[in-house]
Amino acid sequence: MKPAKLVTLNAITDTKVVLIVRLPTAEQSYDVARRAIEGGVRAVEITLTTPGAMGVVERLATEHPEIHIGAGTVLDAHAAYTSISAGARFLVSPQVNTEMIRLANRYQVPTVVGAMTPTEIVTAAEAGADLVKVFPTEAMGRAAVKSVLAPLAHIPLVPAGGATPDNVHEWLAAGVAAIGVGSYITKADDVAANARHFLDVIARAS
């Protein structure tokens, strides 16, 4: 049996998709996540900026033990511990917080840590991040990510923001480990259909 940490990391890098759910209410977050799961999404990040987000993490983790439910915007070790206690199977942070990463590693929970510059990316990797979230991608761009990966190909990057079926092939061609997708799925009229389409495009482009 593979360790749970490796199972989660494999789920992210095999499907190459992390759904980022950042919505105004807990009920919206739960409903969108549930419909995205119906569409085939296997890794779902519920951001802690949503009031009641921890309850959503716990509910989804309980109802969908086969899905990798993560907590996003985890800024410190306390939030990390609370998220893990609620059932989060991976943690996402917009910045490098060594105490948070250390606690996650103690409990063998994968971390996706935010960075933008090459120095920040290396710092995140040296701190023990399993994946490095390139953020904000709108400011950096796909060409820049490809340039960064040239000397840092050994560090698995996950760009977040602005992903659509029209541009994912460019990200994958740049060599990223996975892609964080948000509004294309979370704000769709038919969440499950958009999730299926996005995953299909990713699978064909991989």
Pin down the residues of each PLM region.
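Short acidic, glycine/proline-enriched helix-loop-strand junctions
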Residues: 62-67, 108-111, 155, 160
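Glycine-rich phosphate-binding active-site loops on the catalytic face of alpha/beta enzymes
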Residues: 90-103, 134-142, 174-197
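Conserved functional loop/turn residues at catalytic and ligand-binding sites
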Residues: 40, 87, 95, 108, ...
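Conserved N-terminal beta1-alpha1 strand-loop-helix module at the mouth
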Residues: 1-89, 106, 165-166, 185-206
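Glycine-rich beta-to-alpha transition loops that act as phosphate-gripper elements at the mouths
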Residues: 22-24, 50, 71-77, 93-96, ...
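Catalytic cores of alpha/beta
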Residues: 76-86, 119-127, 144, 150, ...
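Glycine/Thr-rich beta-alpha phosphate-binding loop at enzyme active sites
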Residues: 41-46, 84-89, 105-107, 117-145, ...
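Conserved beta-strand positions in the central sheet of alpha/beta enzyme cores
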Residues: 20, 45, 70, 92, ...
